[in-house]
Amino acid sequence: MIKLSNITKVFHQGTRTIQALNNVSLHVPAGQIYGVIGASGAGKSTLIRCVNLLERPTEGSVLVDGQELTTLSESELTKARRQIGMIFQHFNLLSSRTVFGNVALPLELDNTPKDEIKRRVTELLSMVGLGDKHDSYPSNLSGGQKQRVAIARALASNPKVLLCDEATSALDPATTRSILELLKDINRRLGLTILLITHEMDVVKRICDCVAVISNGELIEQDTVSEVFSHPKTPLAQKFIQSTLHLDIPEDYQERLQAEPFTDCVPMLRLEFTGQSVDAPLLSETARRFNVNNNIISAQMDYAGGVKFGIMLTEMHGTQQDTQAAIAWLQEHHVKVEVLGYV
């Protein structure tokens, strides 16, 4: 549905040349929810704006539903953009128009008959859970409700693609979850292809089928969400995954934790499990194989793309030789082990 090939985007600021995107290629199949994740300044907003040519690529090809957009005339591009809805971080609603009027605007600009506008807007507001807000103004809505209006407006022209530019970044966690569930429901109900950009791996984890990691204007990793969470290939992907799970060291352990080993101490470990290593009885196996005892301090597990992953804080009791052998064995079985210190 979306195929970006060798996209490069260069900005000129006076005598400075800034390369925002460098030879980026991305394929989003029809009906998928595809996430692009990256830190601020990585190029993700520029990338998503190249899809509908809000930013025209310096080089490269943009295919949407089989149509090459970069070669279209302005009138042809305007028509093609009706198939590409877009929502933004800051909603961009017209304060002087009601909820109904905001959603109706693209239909009015397209000279849609009034009775058809009324039918379509009513249908869309019901779909996004705002069936009772026709006559409300944006100033009377919560942030989540404003984004729902923006989603309804983006869907007014029956697009085949929805672009989401940090659509949940301005929302609180509970509202973010409700908006993501709405997008997932719309994707299932309408078969809509969704491309979203975000700096939060939680967003990717909740609704995306595939994910690409962008850094310094380049896609450094892309695969299914389950594969990236199970076998991240880059340090940046690993960092984003770690951000979705966090365990604080209990206060009593922090007081006793030493950086270097001392007499009668035991190592405190942070274990990261992904894919098959989550369900395998690896800690029990280390106890049998290496004569060590594992005391689990705390643990957290989650799912992404149908794959379970998690982290655990443990004490490993045993001789230095046995604990080192057990740690090496865990690492061989795809468990990431970090020695946090000694207690």
Curated annotation (Swiss-Prot):
ATP binds at residues 38-45. CDD domains: ABC_MetN_methionine_transporter. Transmembrane segments: none annotated. Its EC number is 7.4.2.11. SMART domains: AAA, NIL. It is found in: Cell inner membrane. Gene3D superfamilies: 3.30.70.260, P-loop containing nucleotide triphosphate hydrolases. Its main location: membrane. Residues 2-241 form the ABC transporter domain. GO terms for molecular function: ABC-type D-methionine transporter activity; ATP binding; ATP hydrolysis activity. It catalyses: L-methionine(out) + ATP + H2O = L-methionine(in) + ADP + phosphate + H(+); D-methionine(out) + ATP + H2O = D-methionine(in) + ADP + phosphate + H(+). SUPFAM superfamilies: ACT-like, P-loop containing nucleoside triphosphate hydrolases. It is a peripheral membrane protein. Keywords: Amino-acid transport, ATP-binding, Cell inner membrane, Cell membrane, Membrane, Nucleotide-binding, Translocase, Transport. NCBIfam families: ABC_MetN. Part of the ABC transporter complex MetNIQ involved in methionine import. Responsible for energy coupling to the transport system. Belongs to the ABC transporter superfamily. Methionine importer (TC 3.A.1.24) family. The complex is composed of two ATP-binding proteins (MetN), two transmembrane proteins (MetI) and a solute-binding protein (MetQ). This is Methionine import ATP-binding protein MetN. It comes from Shigella dysenteriae serotype 1 (strain Sd197). The gene is metN.
